């Protein structure tokens, strides 16, 4: 009996090993979706389908090509943000944005100042970074509340620097803002953490701040309601407990950072290697533990992560890596 149990364990281990290390050598086209071309059209993964947006509108289709929703608008420079079924398209340097709830034609919001960035939460709450003449402003809206659309307004001043990146928590209750400021000829970054619940009501919503004199924080991102990451030209840092933010991990590289990617469980970085055209891919969990490190080519144009897989679009095709670092797909001259 013991030997039978051992055999089953060996077989199970072999099956698991085969699954996590299997490399595919071919593919089958399950479906082809024709997208109507328009000026400056861009696409993004959305709800197991595709969301396309351009200067004149946005639309989402499922994996079978069935339209889920569409909406029209007129924008010069549309930018997209997605959180679960909600999406926001904002006209950068314009004053309009549209919020989509996954089934309607969009709800319009108009701002008083030019838009620099917009983010959406899983409830449809939107945070917008606006450019005023004397200072920048962060405004948080509920587009579906007819009585009080503007929920919070956070002014910034010259002393705090020029905001370059904001992000809204998935539950819509917090914002992180990274700013750049120049003091006595030296450039530094300041990161502010805001909370709109009762936790932050006695401090004008500010629950944490961090100054960096040795790096420029270019992007901030919530991984979930309680974890966030800050990306700089040197590396990244991990923060937890967004009601009382605390840095729990920091990783720097002495080589150029070529790309960074993430999902709600992992953070990845590709740094330049010692040879031209070669790089190192690193994957970390939200505690800062290194999951894997491996060599990759640097001919990629985009890197994203979803469903615990890393998708790398290259100049000639695509590559897919599992979270253990195994390359499962490698296609060149990919044509569908």
PLM segments and residue spans:
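Conserved small/polar residues in nucleotide/adenosyl-binding loops
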Residues: 2-9, 332-336
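A short beta-strand motif characteristic of beta-propeller blades
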Residues: 28-34, 66-71, 104-110, 149-156, ...
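Beta-strand-rich domains and repeat architectures in extracellular enzymes and scaffolds
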Residues: 30-56, 72-80
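Non-cytosolic head/periplasmic domains of membrane-anchored proteins
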Residues: 82, 86-174
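Structural motif
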Residues: 96-98, 135-139, 184-193, 235-239, ...
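Solenoidal tandem-repeat scaffolds enriched in leucines and small polar residues
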Residues: 138-141, 147-151, 155-215, 221-223, ...
């Amino acid at each position: 009996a013991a030997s039978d149990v051992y055999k089953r364990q060996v077989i199970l281990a072999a099956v698991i090993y085969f699954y996590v290390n299997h490399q595919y050598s071919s593919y089958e086209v399950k479906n082809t979706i024709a997208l109507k071309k328009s000026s400056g059209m861009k696409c993004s993964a959305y709800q197991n389908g595709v969301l396309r947006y351009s200067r004149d509108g946005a639309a989402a289709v499922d994996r079978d090509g069935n339209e889920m929703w569409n909406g029209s608008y007129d924008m010069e420079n549309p930018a997209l943000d997605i959180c679960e079924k909600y999406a926001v398209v904002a006209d950068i340097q314009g004053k309009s944005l549209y919020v989509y709830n996954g089934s309607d034609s969009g709800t319009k919001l108009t701002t008083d100042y030019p838009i620099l960035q917009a983010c959406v939460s899983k409830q449809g709450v939107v945070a917008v970074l606006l450019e005023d003449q004397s200072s920048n402003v962060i405004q948080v809206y509920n587009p579906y509340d007819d009585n009080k659309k503007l929920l919070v307004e956070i002014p910034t001043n010259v002393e705090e620097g020029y905001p370059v990146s904001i992000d809204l928590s998935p539950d819509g209750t917090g914002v992180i803002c990274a700013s750049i400021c120049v003091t006595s000829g030296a450039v530094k970054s300041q990161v502010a953490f805001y909370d709109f619940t009762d936790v932050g009501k006695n401090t004008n919503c500010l629950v944490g701040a961090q100054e960096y004199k040795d790096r420029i924080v270019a992007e901030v991102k919530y991984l979930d309601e309680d974890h966030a990451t800050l990306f700089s030209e040197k590396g990244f840092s991990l923060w937890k407990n967004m009601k009382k933010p605390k840095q729990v991990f920091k990783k720097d590289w002495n080589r150029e950072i070529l790309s960074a990617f993430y999902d709600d469980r992992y953070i990845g970085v590709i740094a330049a290697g010692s040879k031209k055209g070669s790089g190192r891919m690193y994957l970390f969990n939200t505690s800062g533990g290194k999951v894997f490190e491996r060599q990759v080519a640097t001919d990629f144009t985009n890197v994203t992560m979803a469903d615990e897989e890393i998708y790398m679009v290259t100049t000639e095709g695509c590559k897919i890596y599992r979270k253990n670092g195994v390359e499962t797909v490698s296609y060149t001259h990919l044509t569908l």
